[in-house]
């Protein structure tokens, strides 16, 4: 046991050194965004650092484009080999925090059969929705009837939260986007 103690200490230091490394200036994770997921768990956006992410924005009461966005995210993930798939996290943040509370997100995830070990559906405060959408380059506006007019894109973030690729191809697979994911995951981290 005494021999293992230095090894544990070294591993702990390596892990904390990664967390202490400053974020790149163009990292989405620099935003002070607090997320609450479909299970009521809270985390900052920066806490997602360390693994590549497929990110999008949507809202649960959307009947047209948002289901296609979620299906496109699923289709993209399923096009990856199992080893690559295991290294990618999925994050969908709501444009509509007023209506998309935790219970609504959970119900949507269950209805769409989105495995919570793979999918994070999240909400944040309205001002943070605006900040996040701006940094991701997604535009939206609420219409008088309560619906939203919004961009429809999937975005690949690297492990440090930098935008590595994006696609606006919704409803069918974008092979170039899938290849960008494969290349990113294959890169050595360091």
Regions found by a protein language model. Give the residues of each.
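Short loop/turn microsegments at loop-to-beta-strand junctions
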Residues: 30-31, 52-53, 151-153
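A short beta-strand-turn-helix
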Residues: 33-53
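Structural micro-motif
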Residues: 119, 130, 134-143, 147-155
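Short active-site neighborhood of thiol/selenol oxidoreductases, capturing the structured segment around
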Residues: 46-69, 73
């Amino acid at each position: 046991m005494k021999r293992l103690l230095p090894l544990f200490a070294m591993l702990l230091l390596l892990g904390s050194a990664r967390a202490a490394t400053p974020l790149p200036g163009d990292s989405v994770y620099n935003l002070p965004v607090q997320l609450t997921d479909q299970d009521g768990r809270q985390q900052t956006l920066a806490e997602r650092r360390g693994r590549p992410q497929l990110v999008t924005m949507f809202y649960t009461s959307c009947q047209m484009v948002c289901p296609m966005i979620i299906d496109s995210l699923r289709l993209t993930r399923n096009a990856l080999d199992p080893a690559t798939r295991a290294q990618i996290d999925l994050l969908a943040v709501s444009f509509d925090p007023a209506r998309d509370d935790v219970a609504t997100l959970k119900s949507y995830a269950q209805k769409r059969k989105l495995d919570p070990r793979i999918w994070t559906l999240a909400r944040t405060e309205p001002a943070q929705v605006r900040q996040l959408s701006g940094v991701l380059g997604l535009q939206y506006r609420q219409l008088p009837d309560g619906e939203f007019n919004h961009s429809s894109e999937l975005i690949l973030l690297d492990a440090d939260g930098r935008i590595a690729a994006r696609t606006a191809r919704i409803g069918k697979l974008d092979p170039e986007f899938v290849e960008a994911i494969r290349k990113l995951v294959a890169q050595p981290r360091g």
